[in-house]
Amino acid sequence: MSIQHFRVALIPFFAAFCLPVFAHPETLVKVKDAEDQLGARVGYIELDLNSGKILESFRPEERFPMMSTFKVLLCGAVLSRVDAGQEQLGRRIHYSQNDLVEYSPVTEKHLTDGMTVRELCSAAITMSDNTAANLLLTTIGGPKELTAFLHNMGDHVTRLDSWEPELNEAIPNDERDTTMPAAMATTLRKLLTGELLTLASRQQLIDWMEADKVAGPLLRSALPAGWFIADKSGAGERGSRGIIAALGPDGKPSRIVVIYTTGSQATMDERNRQIAEIGASLIKHW
């Protein structure tokens, strides 16, 4: 099914954390194996997209660095402002060389003409462009305002305190710029299926995530033909890696999956491989 024909239905939000955890032992064994292989903590949660029921979880209420996965939440906040008539996706933002930070593959090419809010969200999610994220953060009032937006959604766990690239420092036992797998999964589900955003904005957000171009080595590498995925990855210091995704067979998403890891000395390739293997186990035991 083409994404143009897929529309996320309005689904009432249920308190997922009041429900028991039904784990598929094989996938959780793989998650624990990934911890051993990486020498790191791994957090994992899988939610049913329609009901919000927790299907699997491992360390669901431990804090992990958000890294670039926050960019989906950021663009959700931007879209909320668009829906409220406080922002326009077509508004062009101009910036200078001084605004550029490391890893800005899209924004560095548009110093002369600037970029629209829509283009900045696309760059932030599909290419993980850091300057795009900072420019968008400025439009909503900075990291604290994103945290306030999340609090208003009912997420009192997830917090953004810093700008790119400092938010990726992943300092142990530092709650700044962190989330928990359970909180992130619930918040992502609200953004994609709840009434916080209009149908058009929900569709726009999932379109950007579906067009992600930098998450290929992770869950996408384990995806069978015909499956749908819309995702956003993140990478940080101290061996941190993460991904948030909506995925499912038959060309449409049916589950939310969140995976975070931190504290590893493994290479990026090895971190990617372990997450991909978790994805392969998830799909095998779907």
Curated annotation (Swiss-Prot):
EC number: 3.5.2.6
Span of the signal peptide: 1-23
Keywords: Antibiotic resistance, Disulfide bond, Hydrolase, Plasmid, Signal
S-S pairs: 75-121
Chain sites annotated for binding substrate: 232-234
Top-rank taxon: Bacteria
Family (UniProt): Belongs to the class-A beta-lactamase family.
Protein name as it appears in the record: Beta-lactamase TEM-12
Organism field: Klebsiella oxytoca
